[in-house]
Amino acid sequence: MSGNTIGKLFCVTSFGESHGPAIGCIVDGCPPGLVLSAMDIQLELDRRKPGTSRHVTQRHEGDRVEILSGVFDNITTGTPIALLIRNEDQRSKDYSKIMDVFRPGHADYTYWQKYGIRDYRGGGRSSARETAVRVAAGAIAKKWLHERYGIVIRGYMAQLGPIAIPFKNWEVINQNPFFVADDDYVPKLEAFMDALRKSGDSAGARINVIAEGVPVGWGEPVYDRLDADIAYAMMSINAAKGVEIGAGFNSVTQKGTEHSDEITPEGFLSNNAGGILGGISSSQPITVSVAIKPTSSIRLGRRSIDKAGNPVIVETHGRHDPCVGIRATPIVEAMLAIVLMDHALRHRGQNEDVVCTTPKVPGNIINPTNPVTTQPDVRRAEDPEPDENS
């Protein structure tokens, strides 16, 4: 199997299956000198790990990360960083009834047709379990980006099934099990999920993520555009079925006078472009929205076929997320961080010495209530100033 690596200079290669002994990744290209401990990574993993509420899978994995190489005395050495997370709570017998059938909407059928063999236990390589190591790698990228450039990457759930959740403030996002930015909606979401779980069905979600503080100039046209690489990374996430950047599909109904973001010496007047123009970052906040499909493994009977091609009814019993989108926010943040760090290193390698006499337009801070409007650029007191010499 190929296609297990993302990135050109900051490269992440993942390995492992849902019910194997462990999952892990190799992070290659991280510069030396970054202060990094297992706790830096664990903090992000704990946001994603299963079994944290009744609304997600009850598979209880500690997701304790082990740093096997690339770090000495809590400082990155510039050599490959090997990260390992051991699987501790597999229950493979739950999948014995589907070993010879294909779950509708799942990768079972296509993996079987492509490889002629598949690990049916928990979906094997196609399981969302693999995303834990993306979060681990993304934790490294998030820390490096923040320390070198002051970049802040934050996400939140904007919709769960039919329920759209407005943005209220960032502070409550990590204080509720849904990563929503308005905790007044939590009781409504809990009632929706309780009813969904009892029905045996599943639901989708929409995750928004914003990167603030990205300098102007990152991105490699034409085939390695920053927005193209972001979309590629997001669509590699299990269950992702759509990506929008900036105004996204709303651009279809806009006129040019509405969509094009006017520029003033004080900043941009809107952010329909989502912080990217011509595949290159504009210094505006990068805004991304990802659609997560409903979980394929559900208890309700669905028509399918077995390995012999015979019609069957498939019911999936086991510990599954009724909505994988509930735990997707840290994953989406991680993938954006990985792409941005890769492009930061690529830009530094070729264009660090470029001098442009035109003054740089301030990158206004996004207004999360409306992702295409902006606010004055006010850096948070705790954020470091960008280090142009790093």
Swiss-Prot record:
Enzyme class: lyase
Pathway assigned to this chain's UniProt record: Metabolic intermediate biosynthesis; chorismate biosynthesis; chorismate from D-erythrose 4-phosphate and phosphoenolpyruvate: step 7/7
UniProt-listed Gene3D superfamilies: Chorismate synthase AroC
Biased composition (Polar residues): 366-376
Cofactor(s) this protein cannot do without: FMNH2
Family: Belongs to the chorismate synthase family.
NCBIfam families: aroC, PRK05382.1
Functional note: This reaction introduces a second double bond into the aromatic ring system.
Name of this protein: Chorismate synthase
Organism: Nitrosomonas eutropha (strain DSM 101675 / C91 / Nm57)
Source species taxonomy: Bacteria, Pseudomonadati, Pseudomonadota, Betaproteobacteria, Nitrosomonadales
The gene coding this protein: aroC
